[in-house]
From Swiss-Prot:
Originating organism: Methanocaldococcus jannaschii (strain ATCC 43067 / DSM 2661 / JAL-1 / JCM 10045 / NBRC 100440)
Segments passing through the bilayer: none
Listed name of the protein: Uncharacterized protein MJ0417
Cited SMART domains: POLIIIAc (SM00481)
Pfam families noted in UniProt: PHP_C
Length: 237
């Protein structure tokens, strides 16, 4: 089973992934997505419930959330609210400076207090325009012994599964069947495997990237933003 931990549905204003089509695609491709809409908790029976939460000092994702977290809270208040739910704190594209709310821009990633909250670091985001932000995330996760994960950051249906982790031992009918703690333990096992492959990634990232996922391009990202705005405006969504 493939797990893509960073997927947006049409609930995110920057996405064109209808829920029904998303479900059919994921079932066909044997993908369990984590739906991480911007500042909205979207619960779907085929997906891990998540939310990409904007705060006053960057953004992060809460996985296995039960309640929505409001946008633009103080960073630590938002982190506390996620932790109170027993959910996982996941750092998406933390070093991608092309993102307006990248955590690296707010100089919080090395704060001692912040480090106490983190469970998982996204070490491969397939929408990053270059390999460097992903390599920095990999080094950061290794430095602090955090679990590692991949996410496509899909905004279009054809992007879903561009980055994923394959769990041969994971076979669940509903993502709700899995507890956050159990899933984190599985990720830690996969993290050990990823570190063994790290040398190959560093030696030839442009070749190895196709094994881990597909990198986005600045042209695709520029195009998608225009397409999404035009389509949503015409459909009034």
């Amino acid at each position: 089973m493939k797990v893509d931990l960073h997927v947006h549905s049409i609930v995110s204003k920057c996405s064109l992934n209808p829920k029904g089509l998303l479900e059919k695609f994921c079932i066909k491709k044997n993908i369990v997505p984590a739906i991480c809409d911007h500042n909205k908790l979207t619960k779907l029976n085929f997906a891990i419930p998540g939310e990409e939460i904007a705060t006053n000092s960057g953004e992060f994702i809460g996985l296995f959330l039960t309640e929505e977290i409001p946008a633009n809270l103080d960073l630590y208040e938002a982190l506390d609210r996620v932790r109170e739910q027993g959910a996982l704190i996941y750092l998406p594209h933390p070093f991608d400076l092309n993102r307006r709310r990248s955590l690296a821009k707010f100089n919080v990633l090395e704060e001692r207090e912040f480090l106490k909250y983190v469970h998982v670091v996204e070490v491969f985001n397939s929408r990053c325009r270059s390999i460097e932000p992903n390599l920095k995330a990999l080094e950061y996760a290794e430095k602090y012994d955090f679990a590692m994960a991949f996410g496509s950051d899909a905004h279009f249906i054809w992007e879903v599964g561009n980055a994923y982790i394959k769990f041969s031992e994971l076979n669940i009918e509903k993502p709700d069947d899995l507890s956050p703690k159990e899933f984190l333990n599985l990720l830690k096992i996969k993290t050990d495997e990823l570190l063994k492959a790290k040398s190959n990634l560093l030696k030839n990232p442009w070749k190895t990237r196709w094994h881990y996922g597909k990198l986005g391009s600045k042209y695709n990202i520029a195009l998608y933003s225009k397409v999404v705005k035009n389509v949503r405006r015409k459909l009034n969504i």
